[in-house]
Amino acid sequence: MKKVSVLGSTGSVGKKTVDLLSKRKEEYQVEALSAHSNFALLAHQAKLLNAKYVAISDERLYKDLKESLLGTDVKIAIGATNVAAIPVDLSVVAIVGIAGLGPVMEVIESGTKVIALANKESIVCGGKLLLKKAKEKNVQIIPIDSEHNAIFQILQNDDKCVEKIILTASGGPFLNYSLEQLRNIMVDQALSHPTWNMGKKISVDSATMMNKALEIIEAHNLFNISPDKIEAVVHPESIVHGIVTYKDGFNFAVLAETDMAIPISYALSWPERLVLNYKLDLTKQGKLTFQEPDHKHFPVLKLSMEVLNSSTPQTNSIVLNAANEIAVNEFLKSRIGFLEIVEVVESTMESFGSYTDINSLSDIINIDCESRIIAHKIVESKVVAYS
């Protein structure tokens, strides 16, 4: 029986993971679960999966969680890092944002040998530091993002003579919108993705295509591939998740339905495969289309390449991610407009001036904090100007 932990179990990916695990209790023993604030769902999941440990990040909800688990033997902690330190066979990390970086590092140190990673920000910001530590500890990182999961599967079979990798993007809900239409986007519109069912933050990132920008940086770090060998194409049907082009002209692609249960199950069962009832019928799909991204409407893809080709790519990656997290949060509060998300990111990167060597987790956190302060000031200036 495989021992598993799920960090971020109440988010969209976490809930999918819990659902899969609940149907295979004879194969998986869930040691630990963690959540940010949804104590009621966390308690329900703990009972459902007979988890031994749970952690809540918002310490104000500790008593509520404790009351919800009265009569059980579940041990309760505050903060995901406390349960991340529990060694398991496989840890699923589905925490949103850079908040997942510390727990990922803790999992690597714990003795856990496989990490199923849905937290792209830890790879984007942790970069070489995180991956070096994983290599030292002999930890296998399996990406859950469907695009990187696809590339991972292909490269598992053949990682030599790679010409380029292609990450597909749905284009989000505003693919064919004019700039004037984009200027007037409301929050509920940005949360309505045409092909994927996702959380709020990643839905907005998909709408701005920042999700793909972060994935380009993630692919560079995760697969150690030069930026000039990474390409993004718009594929509205979202059936082809990733393509690897080899030097002899052959292209290998991974195709699957648009359900996160598929890459999650791959990560849970690796190096084996689970039996799932997701059968792709291309005759019913009808057509698969691809097109170049519109960089005028969605400038963040070029921004990610500028980051990777800069003299300080890791620092700039951290700044990019931090500013985006602040901007998306302010957009979700309706304090800034849709197009202003990218404006805040660009202005933050232009204003950031502290470049230091990154040798520790604290170095990353310091850059992240400074970037957030700058981004907040830029947001406030826009709010004042708007009002």
UniProtKB/Swiss-Prot annotation:
Cofactor: Mg(2+); Mn(2+)
Keywords carried by this UniProt record: Isoprene biosynthesis, Manganese, Metal-binding, NADP, Oxidoreductase
One Pfam family, short name: DXP_reductoisom
Stored InterPro entries: DXP_reductoisomerase, DXP_reductoisomerase_C, DXP_reductoisomerase_N, DXPR_C, DXPR_C_sf, NAD(P)-bd_dom_sf
Residue numbers binding 1-deoxy-D-xylulose 5-phosphate: K120, S146, E147, S170, H193, S206, N211, K212, E215
Gene3D superfamilies to which the protein is assigned, alphabetical: 1.10.1740.10, NAD(P)-binding Rossmann-like Domain
UniProt EC number: 1.1.1.267
GO molecular function terms attached to this record: 1-deoxy-D-xylulose-5-phosphate reductoisomerase activity; manganese ion binding; NADPH binding
UniProt: Mn(2+) binding residues: D145, E147, E215
Keyword Transcription (UniProt): no
Residues the record lists as binding NADPH: T10, G11, S12, V13, N38, N119, E121, G199
Pathway: Isoprenoid biosynthesis; isopentenyl diphosphate biosynthesis via DXP pathway; isopentenyl diphosphate from 1-deoxy-D-xylulose 5-phosphate: step 1/6
Keyword NADP listed: yes
Reaction equation(s) it catalyzes: 2-C-methyl-D-erythritol 4-phosphate + NADP(+) = 1-deoxy-D-xylulose 5-phosphate + NADPH + H(+)
One GO term (biological process): isopentenyl diphosphate biosynthetic process, methylerythritol 4-phosphate pathway involved in terpenoid biosynthetic process
NCBIfam families assigned: Dxr (TIGR00243)
Family to which the UniProt record says this protein belongs: Belongs to the DXR family.
Function, as annotated: Catalyzes the NADPH-dependent rearrangement and reduction of 1-deoxy-D-xylulose-5-phosphate (DXP) to 2-C-methyl-D-erythritol 4-phosphate (MEP).
Protein name (record): 1-deoxy-D-xylulose 5-phosphate reductoisomerase
Provenance organism: Wolbachia sp. subsp. Drosophila simulans (strain wRi)
